[in-house]
Amino acid sequence: QEPLLADNILPIEFSNRNNAMRENVYTRKTAIELLKNGGVIAIFPAGAVAWSRKKGLPVEEENWKPMLGRLINQSNCDVMITKFEGQNSKFFQIASRFNQIVRQSLYLYEIKKSLDKPMKFNILKYLKNEDIPKMNDKSLSLHLQRELKKNVNLRIK
């Protein structure tokens, strides 16, 4: 993990290394404990940032992963659905079309580039935990993605 970001980002291991799963389970447990204790986390619920599949096409987001539902179901946290304005650089969009590893390696570049700069975002919906439907992890994640889509013009793959 990039030392500059260590205080602000919980690490996710994308490689196939032997201990990758163990590290990701630890990160998930850490996130759940943060949420149970009133902490706040921001995640990319699709497991990645949105990106443009072809030149000239708008940025699209993948379906949200069950991890979001798991974090909510296991921590009983409230949820604030937020949409950040803008997108990553053209270089990121072009490189993303060629190789997933290149795209992942450019995340740090994009994050570091935006540190200590104002970011525009919209809070679209705040959900108290008692108002969140009781669903399995995957169904809950997709339900929340549909809630976001109702409130903003966002393409979903």
Question: What is the meaning of each model-derived region?
Answer:
Residues Q1-R22:
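Catalytic core of membrane glycerolipid acyltransferases/transacylases, capturing the structured
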Residues V25-K157:
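Non-catalytic C-terminal accessory region of glycerolipid acyltransferases
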